[in-house]
Amino acid sequence: MELAKMSDMTKLHQAVAAGDYSLVKKILKKGLCDPNYKDVDWNDRTPLHWAAIKGQMEVIRLLIEYGARPCLVTSVGWTPAHFAAEAGHLNILKTLHALHAAIDAPDFFGDTPKRIAQIYGQKACVAFLEKAEPECQDHRCAAQQKGLPLDERDEDWDAKKRELELSLPSLNQNMNKKNKKSRGPTRPSNTKGRRV
């Protein structure tokens, strides 16, 4: 991907997408860019999403060290784990899991990273996620029992998801339309002028 096509992305997004570890580190050290900034022109991807897409394990560790949140999602609810699963980046999934990222989070359509890996035929990722998902759930339960906070919620996504849900026609409306079509055209009921 050319940097010219990413003109609206932050310098950090650009450096991560280009795979320039040294520049990423320099930008983070200087505090020039927010590691959690969502680029609306790229479906709300953060630098961490780009690192997962590109399979850049060291960049992921660096971003998280500087405060990047693995729970942040794109405009359709994809976490960095979804992108890693799609591309078959097993080491990225392992790194995210080791950092206690919620690798079992569903997107807007209910697809988890494991389901994405299944769709794209990433068998090694599927096998790993089948073992890792219960561990992720166990960690979540243990943290809850101990009263430890977990960073698994994207507050912006909660509002955006509700907006998306409201913008889609409801299932009942779709069913009513299907039923009307299957019955054929309806005739107006005019019982007043009709002889019995």
UniProtKB/Swiss-Prot annotation:
It comes from the Eukaryota. ANK repeats lie at residues 7-37, 43-72, 76-105. Residues 152-196 are annotated as: Disordered. Pfam families: Ank_2 (PF12796). The keyword Lyase does not apply. Keywords: ANK repeat, Repeat. InterPro entries: Ank_Repeat/CDKN_Inhibitor, Ankyrin_rpt, Ankyrin_rpt-contain_sf. Residues 187-196 have a biased composition (Polar residues). This is Ankyrin repeat domain-containing protein 66. It comes from Homo sapiens.
